[in-house]
Amino acid sequence: MDLVAGDARDVVLVLSVDDTGAFSDPDRFTAHLPLGGGLDPTWLDLFSEAVRSVTGQGEPVDFLDARTELDGTAETVERIVERVDTDWVEAVAAVPDDLHGALAGRWIELLEEELGLLPREEKPWIRDMAGRIVVFTRKAAGARDVIFAWGF
């Protein structure tokens, strides 16, 4: 599962030849955030809710509602490839630095409400991921496309 900022056609090409290492090429892609297989896409809806909660804003919308599937990728790519709405990227990028700790804490609270108590050893990587998502969106703001690629 990856978030990638750059030209959608280049992202699809990289995925079609299964060369995700190319996402780290800054000449081709503005930003890349590998989310790994341990993160469920619905967790990003809870992340969006955490952003709204700590900022007191109505944005971003849930991540599910901020995605639109790219047409014509099913025959070339084994993943679901979706464009992420610019407003979602900009709303997350606008989270002030002094709220990162609160954002991570709120995300963990929401995850625990949904899944039950998380093991203590899971929380540090979730806190880290919250910060990495904000950093990614700041780099991705203004990119031609922001793509979410994931598999079942």
Name each model-derived stretch.
Residues 1-135, 139-143, 151:
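Acidic (Asp/Glu-rich) sequence patches and key acidic residues
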